[in-house]
């Protein structure tokens, strides 16, 4: 080895490159979750959450878009003010991006409610296996400390109650145009909906 420092630098660079990519990819997508949660994935497939990104495409949900004063022929799949409520992890590390869209994140999937799965999935799986085999439960704190989110009401409100004049204190721009004033079906009450 004529240049050990060069080799060391190259090795450290490769390590930094690959470990950085792994750390950035914290959202895994619904395919990872559905490998164990088959019945949940099957029932989710037919929901509006599963088709959330589809609703942003031109020509879809025309009547709703017209009521909300949106152009029904516009492609909103590239609109950063809209996409965030239609995908997993938009604007967050490892989440959906318009520039490098990942299909498993292109819907309101598991990680929209439960948080990015990479850091807690292993402990979540072990807890499930322990429950299935021995009937033992795992403290919620174990997976919460690894990033599994249990603030479901907040997660729902971030999109369903994010409009001007909302009773939710966390409402902020960009606001959803789909409000109860546009159509009563957009009235959201967490306790009744979930």
Question: Model features per residue range: what roles?
Answer:
Residues 1-11:
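Bacterial N-terminal signal peptides that target proteins for export
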Residues 10-12, 21-22:
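Cleavable N-terminal signal peptides
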Residues 20-106, 111, 117-150, 172-194:
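Sequence context of c-type cytochrome heme-c attachment sites
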Residues 153:
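Short, functional "switch" segments adjacent to catalytic/cofactor/reactive centers
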